[in-house]
């Protein structure tokens, strides 16, 4: 992750399998104020050991789903990021 520019602290919430793998329901990370969703996902996967579910994760920024991994995300201090794996069940 390239952090040459300004960096902010973001709250990360983990759900279901991502919570189990990260071994915590929530954390904080420092991220650049502007980053692609792919770069962000790769950083979270590496930092929190989410490799086994990487290809199935959904990210949400301030309660809005990130639909395209090529999207650039603009973060402000204290923003919220949710890491959501697909839910299964019946």
From Swiss-Prot:
Localization per record: Cytoplasm
Gene3D superfamilies: 3.10.20.30
Any one GO MF annotation of this record: nucleotide binding
Cited InterPro entries: Beta-grasp_dom_sf, MOCS2A, MOCS2A_euk, Mopterin_synth/thiamin_S_b, ThiS/MoaD-like
Keywords tagged on the record: Cytoplasm, Molybdenum cofactor biosynthesis, Nucleotide-binding, Phosphoprotein
Maturation and modification: C-terminal thiocarboxylation occurs in 2 steps, it is first acyl-adenylated (-COAMP) via the hesA/moeB/thiF part of MOCS3, then thiocarboxylated (-COSH) via the rhodanese domain of MOCS3.
Signal peptide: none
Coiled coil, from the record: none
Further remark: This protein is produced by a bicistronic gene which also produces the large subunit (Mocs2B).
Function: Acts as a sulfur carrier required for molybdopterin biosynthesis. Component of the molybdopterin synthase complex that catalyzes the conversion of precursor Z into molybdopterin by mediating the incorporation of 2 sulfur atoms into precursor Z to generate a dithiolene group. In the complex, serves as sulfur donor by being thiocarboxylated (-COSH) at its C-terminus by MOCS3. After interaction with Mocs2B, the sulfur is then transferred to precursor Z to form molybdopterin.
Protein's name according to its UniProt entry: Molybdopterin synthase sulfur carrier subunit
């Amino acid at each position: 992750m390239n952090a040459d520019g300004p960096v902010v602290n973001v709250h990360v919430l983990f759900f279901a399998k991502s919570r189990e793998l990260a071994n915590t329901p929530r954390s904080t990370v420092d991220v650049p104020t502007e980053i692609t969703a792919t770069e962000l996902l790769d950083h979270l996967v590496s930092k929190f050991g989410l490799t086994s579910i990487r290809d199935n994760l959904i990210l949400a920024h301030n309660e809005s789903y990130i639909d395209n991994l090529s999207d650039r995300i603009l973060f402000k201090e204290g923003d919220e990021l949710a890491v959501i794996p697909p839910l299964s069940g019946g």
